[in-house]
Amino acid sequence: MKNLITGVAVSGLLAAVVSGQAAASKTVNGIQVSVAKIERMEKAALKDCPPGTNTVNAVQRPGDELAVVTVNFKVMPDFKPAMFKRPTATAADDKVYNTSVQFVEVGSVPEYSCQFIYRVPTGTKLKAFTVEGTTFDIAALDK
């Protein structure tokens, strides 16, 4: 009985740890992609991806907030240079949001992280992040 209780406790702890981790990685056009986190900010830099010299800032407006989705990228050996479209974020109500952040020279750096900024109504929960037709479930990351 004691082992059963310990097993249940460990399983619950493991589930809690896993739910707070990044969304599973997927390979998109020869690049391994994983969504690391979602943060809410009043101001955020609209840097290119991979991060470059773009210095424009996004600022929160009344009634809106900035949902910042951090995504990790790793260029795989089978990557072939290509233009990537701007990724989108989908809210729990199925509304799709666009970002101003754009991809520039995607394979120029072997590994990098980018922040994609989405202006959404206050309280909006994001459920999906889509890049090049590949969708990531991010609902567990949006707390």
Question: Over which residues does each language-model region extend?
Answer:
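Bacterial N-terminal signal peptides
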Residues: 7-16
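Positively charged n-region of N-terminal signal peptides that target proteins for export
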Residues: 1-4
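Conserved functional micro-motifs across diverse proteins
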Residues: 7, 20-143
